[in-house]
Amino acid sequence: MIDNHFTEIADLESLDRFVANLNGSAGVVFKHSDTCGISARAYTEMSKLELPIGIVVVQHARSVSDEVEKRWQVNHETPQVLIIKDGKSVWNASHFQVKADEVAAAAAKVDSEQ
């Protein structure tokens, strides 16, 4: 079950819609595995944030996960967080580097660089 804090990205249309709805602000694409303990910890971290967060559960949306890798030229990892601004990936982290305070700081920095 996905927390109400997240927007589920289950197909390419919902990925495009999520990115478009950011309207120039920074947002997060969070690739999550529902069978991984490290990903469960990252899920808890991401739940602390007050940012737009789109979640891709890789077991249910493999085509979306593949598109994230292709579109933003990042190697596939889970858990993985990408900060998206103006349709571009401007920051990313994976595994134990997925920490709420670091994601929030990176997003704030990106948003201040207008």
Give the label of every model feature segment.
Residues M1-N23, E113-Q114:
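N-terminal leader/targeting and pre-domain segments
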Residues K31, L51-E67:
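Thiol-based oxidoreductase modules, predominantly thioredoxin-like and allied folds used
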Residues I38-E45, H60-V64, V68, P79, ...:
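Amphipathic alpha-helical interface surfaces
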Residues R41-G54, K70, K85, W91, ...:
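Non-catalytic interaction surface on structured domains
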Residues W72-K85:
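Structural micro-motif
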Residues K85-Q114:
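Non-catalytic, surface beta->alpha helical segment in thiol-disulfide oxidoreductase systems
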